[in-house]
Amino acid sequence: MKILLTLDNPYESDNPYFRELIDNIKKIDSEIEFDWGIKKFWANNSFDIVHIMFPHFLLKIGDKNEEHSLEELELRLQVLKNKNIKIVSTCHNIVPHYKSNIEQIQSYDCVYRYSEHIYHLGDYSRGVFEKKYPNANNLLLEHPVYNDLYTEFPSREKALKKLKLSSKYKYILCIGAFRDDEERKLICKIVKSFKKKKIKILAPLFCKIKFKKNIFSLIKEVFTYLRYKILFKRIVFTGKSVSDTLLSYYMSVSDVSLIQRVKILNSGSLPLNYYFGNVVVGPNVGNVGEILKKTGNPTFDVTDLNSLPVAIRAGFDLFYMGLGSENKKIAEKNWLIKHISDKQISYYKLLKISGRGGVNKYILDKIYSGKINYSFMHSSLLFVKRCA
């Protein structure tokens, strides 16, 4: 089975999501072959499955060598479908965040309309898409925990020493990039609300200097960086990404983690923090809000910043009541990388057997609707493979 992922080389990305899934899927089933690249999407018809990740990447807006129109995208999807190449997509976003180009926004609807499977990282988007795209099979494929990558759980004392932090403070962790000033406002709100408390915020990428050719733009970047350093001393940031080695220490030193997003559907930070036993505070938005509420973690209202300090206080209270330990159990039971990889393999194989005569359509419909659980689905696929 040959599968094309519509993204650039995943082994050159800071985000381990794609390479972790690729490596673990290949360990489980050596018959699955992966390739990637936007150019191959437009030129190559030799794949069994085309798995689309971020639809707007296919247009390459602003790249004169690879730029394509929305009309060209729809024609290409029609060609793939006519050649019986299966089209599937993962719903990382319903529409792209912070994009204003109308064709980039419309590319999402275009791809989802042509997808036979749409994989969802939570039940919120799955519910929305079952109404909006009823002809697709909307399937749950949660964000994995990279338990093969993060194997160390250093003690709080060891983590404090490693990161050169004082034991006098409680720490709130915000990992990941800050995409807009409205996300920085969340952190500044916490600092102002807890100025009399011994609380610091670990936000490595809170502000970074982007080196630009324009000297005035560069001066502005440096000024902004220094301004935050001087005025917000309780925000600990370096402007650099945290290595996989150091990330375990950041996780271990923090009791509460904040997902600093206003516009969001999914978050890789959420399952990872659960795995390390932290309580997670996040926006009551998308799959993130749905998962947090379902598991008893605090949420805040993105339209009311005053709800954020309330959620943070609740987060610390819940940590001391043992919610972090419960979160860890949830992650270990549901989100380990092997479990999610197994699930993805089964979904890929469903594409093959769903079009094959002799397979019970009633069972397939039950699997697609979620009325047959994953374990039964996996056993059914093994049986079909033996009978094929």
Task: Describe the function of each predicted region.
Residues 294-306, 313-320:
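Conserved acidic donor-binding segment of nucleotide-sugar-dependent glycosyltransferases
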Residues 319-374:
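A charged, aromatic-enriched C-terminal amphipathic alpha-helix characteristic of glycosyltransferases
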Residues 130, 145-162, 169, 183-185, ...:
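Acidic anion/phosphate-binding donor-loop and adjacent secondary structure
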